[in-house]
Amino acid sequence: MKETKILSIQVGLPKMLDEAETTNSTGKPWTTGIFKTAICAPVWVGKHNLIGDAQADLSVHGGTHKAVNVYPSEHYPYWRQELHLTEMPYGAFGENFTTCGLLEDEVCIGDVFKAGETIVQV
């Protein structure tokens, strides 16, 4: 079995972006939950989200069957190069878990993983 690691865990609360910060097509303020901060302690994973984490649009993010967002660290070098960035911290894509060794083409709906004491299912 291939080894998978969680390299970083991030949480964050929704933030209102004003006209100066927004890049959406309307130019109007909007709320997003994409901004995450790395934590260095165990975190409780519940049915709807991680403790200290929340989503802005619950119709498409968070809640039952959408509690944890995972993104592979293997994609970060591509995006740093594509966006001409020297730094891009884990969590930049709004993910809760930044992993190593867990790529999309190796994961199927229904797969079950153990993360510490938590069991998560895709």
Language-model segments: residues:
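Electropositive, beta-rich accessory/interaction domains or terminal extensions
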Residues: 1-115, 119-122
